[in-house]
């Protein structure tokens, strides 16, 4: 059944589609433009059209699908390769005509376009939403032949036929992102105008009027590009594709009364989800599931906890499942929701990734540069014990723990430096990264001198075991050392960036002298990486590296169970404790360690807990770590943080299972994995790991890190324009010259590893475990009532800390300095003195000495964000204008930088320069139309949106996102840009551009409201005395005053 119309849009003659059909009703019909007869045809269904179309003569098959922009639609691309067509665009190669003169070049370009589409899809949907696209989900059609001018023309349609976007705006921006990523000479072949609000798109089997080029399936294309082989006609249609996966709304701001949905709730999960409805079901009954939403029908009036009022008519209740969390929503309030709880069996990212590892759909081994060495420079094998080490100038050994690396090292020393060897009198230096590791090594090499057991000059001892921080006790001599041993070499390199060195410069200098000049160097590590290769290649490049690698998988019998759910992890832990199992719990979070200790003590007061952290006394660490066999043999539960790593090993088979809790806010993946091996033998060989990590956006390559680092220092030498925040180089100071020293290169390598861990903590952790040969599984478990108790204890611990600090002794600067020195030198400090020192630092930070403080004060003002905002506000309000403040800060940091480069380069690299972050934050604020952080003016919605579009479409925000470690926003969406700007302003100043009743103004965040700008010091609370001159209100909006005035307190 069909109806015909002369026009699509309404007109006075009543002959248009819109005269009879509303946009809403057109959703359920199929609209076709008949080019041959110059008509629009409305069919009841697609099937009706296909049946009618089959009966039409070939020359009249000029049909185009009418795609309405407001409807969901497939992503599509129209590719044209005309012959002998001139292009006036300067960006196009002069030889563009020749590009399409043979099929091979056409196919090369087409393949390039498909690859870019897949790359943009991966960045937009796969990474954040885990929605994948393969070539088999891409459909290619062609229409090759002569056009109306009798010229040969290649034309292709690329359709992502298994996915759809919400509307034409989503499709339009996705297409623009593809175009941005195409090479300039390819850009003209892609039509950017195929996503209009009403779009005609040729239907399969049709041709344009006057041309015999028919759009058709092409098996050859599918074979060449490995794309879909479907010949189902409906797969080529664009509009209302019900059988597709609807992609998340990314680029446009669409208001909906129903929260967005994504993954479909499985039937196995529905029963558990419905349990969260609880008492809500007294007034509602289950209606149906729509993707990740559970919809309910109202049976009687009820009170809504979200709206805080009664609802008595419509069906307002919705439960949404995101990840493993269940949220309550109300259709009347789309801005707020209530967290109901967590599902025990819902797979989150960790579980999904483990599942992919289990099915071997992911390559877990990360190749390193040593593996690429030529065969004569490698010895690779797979045996349960180590083979003899080679006598070569630079030997690098990689093997898992407990395969015999140290045993073979002893054999090496005996063979080449024993009593019967010609080298027995030669100098050997064995460098370690921890004091306890040094003692551990000496117990296995008794003929070596331990640096901590002798005083004075160490050069007179031929064989010395020495920790990194004490290398300054050695001196360079005319003769190089014969053998330098670097056990746990990656950790040694890490230690140079620890900030714990009292005499960094001489220690690093002697290390580099030995590394560059030693006759022989042996590096050993189970977690060997590219950092070691790059450092050796750079500083021992004159001698070849030899790679000795035993690939034996000693961990092949170990079983690792992963989860992202703290609740699942805790329930498993509680179950094992109830079964009286002895547990090892490593974690890289001090708060989590303390929380677990308190939680277990309350649940199981009879159990003995061993607890070690950075807060443990120096005496306890030294005595216990030197005799772990005794002390750990006394406990039922062992909890520790990264204060225990390599060098501490418990060999007895006492503990049953290990529970690890790790996140990406602390040490890197390699250190976390090392922590798992401190107890060498578990009875069950079972490891249960909870991994948590927020998304980070740190620069990951050496090139990006170097660019970011030098850029921060580069801006210190530039002159600021008062009007546009543009820069020129200062004639007096000139451009900076950077000396790339050995430490600089080591620092870059270390930053790269840290950033990789922060950005990809979960995947790298699981990969490294799986690469050892261990079996990996998803951790599941019964649901128990533990989370509320756990959270309650966490709040108790935090509150007690606040109480302890607030009630601690008020000490003066002299005592504070003494405590600081004792802590730095490892001298035990009394717990009460530690709280007093924390109190002193808090009062000193805000210049709040002489005031009595409460636990609430400590909670609010000792937070990282409040302190960061306070510092930012102080720095930006020192001058009469923000530009004057910026110049003052720039001068201060430039002076430090120049001093550091002359005296202590490591201080420069470890210093957190803040000028550039202020410069970017103020730049964003001014581009929005505000003059400074205290601007009281108000912008209308139209004014701000226009600014966001005009100012940011052409502005590259990469440097800003690097600076603040934020994801770069989509520049085509003003609301996304505003969210990005508010994150920056919130991090730097505790401010945001707030929206209220169609107007925008600067307002404090929660942290910012604690530290108001004032003209003169006030007594009520810490504040920022601002020198910024007041700004005159110029807004046309007179009836409303910006709340920024509330933050500027007069006395």
Swiss-Prot record:
Pfam families in the cross-refs: Herpes_ori_bp, Herpes_UL52
Keyword tags: DNA replication, Early protein
Record Gene3D superfamilies: P-loop containing nucleotide triphosphate hydrolases (3.40.50.300)
Gene Ontology BP, a term: DNA replication
Record bears the keyword Endoplasmic reticulum: no
Highest taxon, organism lineage: Viruses
Inducing or repressing factors: Expressed in the early phase of the viral replicative cycle.
SUPFAM superfamilies assigned to the protein according to its UniProt record, in alphabetical order: P-loop containing nucleoside triphosphate hydrolases
InterPro entries noted in UniProt: P-loop_NTPase, Replication_origin-bd
An example Gene Ontology molecular-function term: ATP binding
Task of the protein: May be involved in DNA replication.
Family named by the database record: Belongs to the asfivirus F1055L family.
Protein's UniProt name: Putative helicase/primase complex protein
Organism per entry: African swine fever virus (isolate Tick/South Africa/Pretoriuskop Pr4/1996)
């Amino acid at each position: 059944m069909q109806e015909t119309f002369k026009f699509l849009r309404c007109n006075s003659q009543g002959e248009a589609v819109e005269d009879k059909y509303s946009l809403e009703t057109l959703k359920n019909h199929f609209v076709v433009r008949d080019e041959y007869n110059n008509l629009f045809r409305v069919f009841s269904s697609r099937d009706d059209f296909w049946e009618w179309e089959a009966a039409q003569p070939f020359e009249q098959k000029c049909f185009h699908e009418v795609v309405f922009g407001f409807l969901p639609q497939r992503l599509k691309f129209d590719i044209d390769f005309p012959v002998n067509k001139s292009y006036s665009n300067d960006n196009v190669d002069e030889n563009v005509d020749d590009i399409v003169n043979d099929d091979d070049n056409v196919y090369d370009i087409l393949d390039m376009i498909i690859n870019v589409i897949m790359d943009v899809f991966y960045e937009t949907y796969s990474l954040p939403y885990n929605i994948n696209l393969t070539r088999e989900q891409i459909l290619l059609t062609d229409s090759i032949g002569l056009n109306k001018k009798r010229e040969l023309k290649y034309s292709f349609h690329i359709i992502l036929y298994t996915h759809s976007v919400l509307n034409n705006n989503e499709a339009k921006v996705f297409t623009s992102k593809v175009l941005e990523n195409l090479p300039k000479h390819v850009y003209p072949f892609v039509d950017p105008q195929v996503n209009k609000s009403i779009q005609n798109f040729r239907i399969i089997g049709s041709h344009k009027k006057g041309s015999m080029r028919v759009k058709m399936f092409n098996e050859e294309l599918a074979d060449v590009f490995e794309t879909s082989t479907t010949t189902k006609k409906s797969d080529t249609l664009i509009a209302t594709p019900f059988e597709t996966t609807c992609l998340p709304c990314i680029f446009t701001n669409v208001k909906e009364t129903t929260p967005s949905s994504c993954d479909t709730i499985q039937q196995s999960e529905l029963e558990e989800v419905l349990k969260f409805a609880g008492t809500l079901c007294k007034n509602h009954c289950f209606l149906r599931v729509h993707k990740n939403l559970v919809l309910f029908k109202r049976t009687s009036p009820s009170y809504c906890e979200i709206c805080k009022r009664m609802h008595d008519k419509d069906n307002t209740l919705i439960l949404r499942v995101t990840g493993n969390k269940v949220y309550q929503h109300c259709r009347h309030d789309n801005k707020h929701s209530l967290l109901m709880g967590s599902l025990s069996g819902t797979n989150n990212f960790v579980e999904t990734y483990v599942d992919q590892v289990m099915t071997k759909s992911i390559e877990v081994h990360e190749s390193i540069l040593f593996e690429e060495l030529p065969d004569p420079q490698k010895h690779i094998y797979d045996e349960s014990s180590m083979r003899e080490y080679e006598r070569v100038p630079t030997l690098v050994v990689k093997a898992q723990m407990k395969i015999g690396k140290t045993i073979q090292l002893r054999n090496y020393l005996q063979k080449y430096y024993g009593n019967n060897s010609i080298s027995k009198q030669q100098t050997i230096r064995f460098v370690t990264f921890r004091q306890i590791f040094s003692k551990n090594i000496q117990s296995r090499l008794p003929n070596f001198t331990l640096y901590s057991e002798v005083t004075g000059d160490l050069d007179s001892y031929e064989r010395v075991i020495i920790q990194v921080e004490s290398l300054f006790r050695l001196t360079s001599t005319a003769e190089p050392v014969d053998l330098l041993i670097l056990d746990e070499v990656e950790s040694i390199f890490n230690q140079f960036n620890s900030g714990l060195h009292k005499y960094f410069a001489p220690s690093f200098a002697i290390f580099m002298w030995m590394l560059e000049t030693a006759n022989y160097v042996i590096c050993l590590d189970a977690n060997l990486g590219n950092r070691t290769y790059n450092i050796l290649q750079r500083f021992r490049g004159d001698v070849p590296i030899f790679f000795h690698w035993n690939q034996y998988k000693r961990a092949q019998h170990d079983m690792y169970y992963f989860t992202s759910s703290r609740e699942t992890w805790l329930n498993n832990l509680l179950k094992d404790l109830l079964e009286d199992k002895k547990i090892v719990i490593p974690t890289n979070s001090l708060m989590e360690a303390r929380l677990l200790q308190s939680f277990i003590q309350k649940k199981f007061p009879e159990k003995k807990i061993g607890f070690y952290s950075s807060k443990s006394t120096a005496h306890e660490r030294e005595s216990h770590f030197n005799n772990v066999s005794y002390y750990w043999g006394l406990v039922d539960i062992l909890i520790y943080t990264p204060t225990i790593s390599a060098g501490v090993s418990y060999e007895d088979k006492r503990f049953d299972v290990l529970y690890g809790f790790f996140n990406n806010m602390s040490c890197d993946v390699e250190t976390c994995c090392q922590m798992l091996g401190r107890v060498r033998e578990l009875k069950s060989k079972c490891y249960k790991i909870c991994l948590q990590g927020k998304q980070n956006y740190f620069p990951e390559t050496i090139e990006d890190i170097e660019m970011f680092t030098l850029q921060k220092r580069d801006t210190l030498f530039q002159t600021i324009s008062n009007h546009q925040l543009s820069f020129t180089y200062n004639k007096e100071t000139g451009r900076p010259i950077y000396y790339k020293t050995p430490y600089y290169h080591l620092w870059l390598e270390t930053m790269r590893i840290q950033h990789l861990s922060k950005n990809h903590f979960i995947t790298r952790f699981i990969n490294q475990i799986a690469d050892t040969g261990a079996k990996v599984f998803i951790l599941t478990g019964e649901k128990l009532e533990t989370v509320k108790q756990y959270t309650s204890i966490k709040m108790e611990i935090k509150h007690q800390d606040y109480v302890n600090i607030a009630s601690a002794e008020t000490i003066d600067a002299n005592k504070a300095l003494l405590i600081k020195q004792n802590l730095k030198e490892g001298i035990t400090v009394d717990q009460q003195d530690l709280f007093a020192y924390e109190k002193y630092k808090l009062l000193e930070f805000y210049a709040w000495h002489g005031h009595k403080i409460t636990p609430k004060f400590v909670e609010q003002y000792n937070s990282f964000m409040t302190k960061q905002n306070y510092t930012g506000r102080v720095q930006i309000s020192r001058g009469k204008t923000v530009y004057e403040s910026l110049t003052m800060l720039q001068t201060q940091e430039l002076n430090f930088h120049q001093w550091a480069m002359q005296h202590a380069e490591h201080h420069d690299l470890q210093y957190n320069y803040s000028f550039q972050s202020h410069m970017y934050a103020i730049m964003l604020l001014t581009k929005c139309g505000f003059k400074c952080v205290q601007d009281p003016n108000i912008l209308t919605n139209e004014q701000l949106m226009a600014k966001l579009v005009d100012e940011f479409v052409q502005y590259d925000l990469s440097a800003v996102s690097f600076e603040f470690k934020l994801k770069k926003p989509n520049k085509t969406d003003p609301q996304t840009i505003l969210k990005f700007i508010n994150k920056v302003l919130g991090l730097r100043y505790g401010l945001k551009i707030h929206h209220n009743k169609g107007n925008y103004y600067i307002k404090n965040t929660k942290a910012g409201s604690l530290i108001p700008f004032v003209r003169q010091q006030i007594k009520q609370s810490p504040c920022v005395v601002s020198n910024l001159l007041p700004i005159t209100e110029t807004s046309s909006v007179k009836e409303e005053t910006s709340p920024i005035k509330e933050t500027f307190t007069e006395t």
